[in-house]
Amino acid sequence: MSHHRLSRRGLLAGTAGAALITATAATSRAAAAEVPPPDPQWARPPHQVEAEMLVDYLRTLPWSEQAQVNRYKTAGEFPDESSSAKWGAAGHPEQFSVLAQCSSFLTMVLERTYGANSAYGWATKEYFSQYFHTEDGKLFPTAEKFRTGFADAAETPHFTGVTKPVNLRPGDLVAFDYDSENTTEPYTGHIVMVKERMGTWASSVDSQVGSNVVPYVFEIVDCTSNPHGNPAASDSAEAIYRAFPDTRIEEHVGATPEWTEHNGAGYGHIVFYADATTKLFAGYRWDVNSSTAHTAAERPIAAARVYPR
């Protein structure tokens, strides 16, 4: 695979080309969706500020150090270590760390921001147990429990449901189940926080969800063992990846292998599909280079917005 580097001008031109592809390949569905541009005016909610602070400080560390303090808690590993997310003092990135799965990471972000020691006081273990049904013996709800709670957000204090990808704002949480036969062990699904809506990106893979869908790309914050993107997936994958990167993928210029995947908390990009007619969630794709997309019927999706007060 080549090490062709895209200039900012080239990258913007490539993005413009992608927009043209979207408009040409999916004119009817894009027109029906009335896709708005990204809105820079939404203020980041407090929990997004806290999540990004943690990720950004960890990113300032060398890769070798990040690998020791920013880790995904893979099932069966780290039996003697509890899930944790630690925020340090300003200017001390070495004091920040993560050892978590997707749901425990975002639960700890909410607990830090709105928990008993905050000005808000509601995001406690008791709250998550009552409204997101934390399983006996567990400290955090699973992604599956979050998805169920978001789907019933009208009955969940401090959350309101978001049923359409086009309405997602920075800080909103989106959870989806994995296949029904695999929703108990070891992983039930995945949950992410929206960082920014990036626009749409059409692909032949979209047809796996349906012929009348709109593929919205979102930059997200999450904790995962599988970064969102594979720059080595195909001859064209590197250029696309550079437009929609993941902070957990390390590049080795001029070396073999050229890329190393890391895990833990970071930023990536995911595709959420909307039905062009109803605007409701229709499915998702893990990243813009993924060759597989999943329908919402196959893997249910629900999203919610946090209201601090």
Task: Map each language-model feature to its residues.
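N-terminal secretory signal peptides and thylakoid transit peptides that target proteins
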Residues: M1-A18
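Residue-level marker of regulatory loop/turn positions in helix-turn-helix DNA-binding domains and
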Residues: H4, V98, T184
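Hydrophobic h-region of N-terminal signal peptides that target proteins for export
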Residues: A19-T24
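C-terminal segment of N-terminal export signals and the immediately downstream linker at the start
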Residues: A26-P38
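N-terminal capping segments
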Residues: V35-H133, A274, K279-R309
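...with weaker cross-activation on analogous glycine-rich loops/strands in unrelated enzymes
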Residues: A123-P227
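Low-complexity, Gly/Ser/Thr/Pro-rich intrinsically disordered linker/tail segments
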Residues: D222-R309
